[in-house]
Amino acid sequence: MPREIKDIKDFLLKARRKDAKSVEIKKNPENVKFKVRCSRFLYTLVITDKEKAEKLKQSLPPGLQVKEVK
């Protein structure tokens, strides 16, 4: 089931959880979507600023599988 997250800090907390499996990054011309797959929900964060998206990509946990989709 999908859930949308508005706060970057909340998204990072979800990504650091034990049941977080992978992160999908979808880049569009106007925004970047980060989708983290946990056991029950798929959490989505939409960012319109490209620089913030790059910083968030750098701060993802290292053990998490990251998949980029164009």
UniProtKB/Swiss-Prot annotation:
Give the top-rank taxon of the lineage listed in the UniProt record for this protein: Eukaryota
Q: Show the disulfide pairing.
A: none
Pfam families recorded for this chain?
A: Ribosomal_L38e
What InterPro entries would the database entry show? Ribosomal_eL38 (IPR002675), Ribosomal_eL38_sf (IPR038464)
GO CC: one term?
cytosolic large ribosomal subunit
Q: Which GO terms describe its molecular function?
A: structural constituent of ribosome
Mention one GO biological process in which this protein takes part, according to its record: translation
Keywords associated with the record: Ribonucleoprotein, Ribosomal protein
The UniProt entry, under PANTHER family, shows: 60S RIBOSOMAL PROTEIN L38, LARGE RIBOSOMAL SUBUNIT PROTEIN EL38
Family, per the entry? Belongs to the eukaryotic ribosomal protein eL38 family.
Protein name in the entry: Large ribosomal subunit protein eL38
Q: Which organism is it from?
A: Lonomia obliqua
Origin organism lineage: Eukaryota, Metazoa, Ecdysozoa, Arthropoda, Hexapoda
